[in-house]
Amino acid sequence: MIRPIDRYRKTKKRRLKTSNIHQNDVVSSPICNHLHGHAEIPEELIFSEILTRLPVKTLIKFKLVSKTWNSLISTPLFIKSHLKQTISNPYVPYNCVFIRSPYYFYILNYGAYDRCPNDRSGEKGLMRVNNLNYYDNGVNTFLMGSCNGLVCFGRGGAITGYEYCFYVYNPVMDLIFDVLDPLGNFQWMLMCGFGYVSCKDDYLLLVGGLQKRSSKTFVYVFSLKSKTWRKIRVFDEGELSIFSGGKGVLVNETLHWDLTQVWTPGVKSVCGFDLVDETFKEVEMPRMLLGNRVNLGFKLCDINGCLGGWVVFVDGVVEMWVLKQYGAWDSWMNLFKFDMLPGFRNFCGWTENGKVLLQTDDGSLLLADPKQNPAKYNSLVNYLGDIETVSFVQTAVSPIF
């Protein structure tokens, strides 16, 4: 007679034997062997095809995985690959502006309001940059330009005795590089700009202005790679007849300024500085804007990589022009025109769907659809005061070479 305990032991042994047979069959299966051999993604594929496509904020978290990952993600080769993917990826926040207000720096992803108007989560909203604080309430702070995720701004002016200093900053990575005034004796900053030269793999900072006890305009360029200033040109009084050029508009690796001639204030012209060969050149304006029609002002802007120019006429109509082919000055084309709302100051950005970001005198930012007549406005930010904006893309590019 078999005892119950012996029957249980025999049944358990039989089950274990059957289970081992099935396990061996699974392991020895050619299909399972193939799947098992590809269970882990090659690390090269992870870095070249996966991590390069992630938003930079997510990428920062992956740097904490290990010292090896941190080192590889920080290499110039990976950063360039990530930058290329970021600019070409429509799902990564690209339509952003970096804002200087009287008290703080901000980042606004205005493109999210156009892509997902009913979504109240995600990347929407005004994000304050907490890593930088003003010591003078921003009175003497001015934006100089932005390129590939790096923002260039300066501080100085009459209140500081015209002592200037400049900064190249990645607000997402919280990396900053300080640049001193080339001579320390600028009397007044007339023009400035910031851009990237691909053939030299270098970022250049341009400043031009009057020096103390001199009527000449001096123009200097700073190389972020060599960390040196170079004097580019000295203009005699009246040779570069400008009242104030401000920050240059970067298109085709060339900085552009709309200039007011000193001796004839009503006459406007466009000046370009080629960052590649470091020479000044004249850019022809749209012929339609050179007629007798009275206008209140003409300004330049960047329209998704093309040079744009807009003009406000006395009747309140705004016309936007775009240079379709750079260098072919007869390719200026009228993009749109519509009646502008009171208090309009500047165009700040463009979405993929053709909507424009507008700035008003009180520091409000609105998204407008110029294709509708009258134009439809969507208020994004209200009453920031006296602000400046530059287009901005979130990248892992470092200002420290």
Each language-model region and where it sits:
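N-terminal entry/capping and adjacent linker segments that precede and initiate structured domains
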Residues: 1-401
